[in-house]
Amino acid sequence: MSTIISYFGFLLASIIFTLILFISLSKIQLI
């Protein structure tokens, strides 16, 4: 059970990190 939770947390963190990178790149292109 804890393995599934830790895997879900890692997946969520990677998605958030990717979104932050994408947003920052978009802002750089807009400028």
UniProtKB/Swiss-Prot annotation:
Coiled coil: none annotated. Pfam families: PetL. This is Cytochrome b6-f complex subunit 6. The gene is petL. GO terms for cellular component: chloroplast thylakoid membrane; cytochrome b6f complex. Belongs to the PetL family. GO terms for molecular function: electron transporter, transferring electrons within cytochrome b6/f complex of photosystem II activity. The chain crosses the membrane at residues 3-23. Component of the cytochrome b6-f complex, which mediates electron transfer between photosystem II (PSII) and photosystem I (PSI), cyclic electron flow around PSI, and state transitions. PetL is important for photoautotrophic growth as well as for electron transfer efficiency and stability of the cytochrome b6-f complex. The 4 large subunits of the cytochrome b6-f complex are cytochrome b6, subunit IV (17 kDa polypeptide, PetD), cytochrome f and the Rieske protein, while the 4 small subunits are PetG, PetL, PetM and PetN. The complex functions as a dimer. It comes from Abies homolepis. Its main location: plastid. It is a single-pass membrane protein. The lineage of its organism: Eukaryota, Viridiplantae, Streptophyta, Embryophyta, Tracheophyta. GO terms for biological process: photosynthesis. It is found in: Plastid, Chloroplast thylakoid membrane. Keywords: Chloroplast, Electron transport, Membrane, Photosynthesis, Plastid, Thylakoid, Transmembrane, Transmembrane helix, Transport.
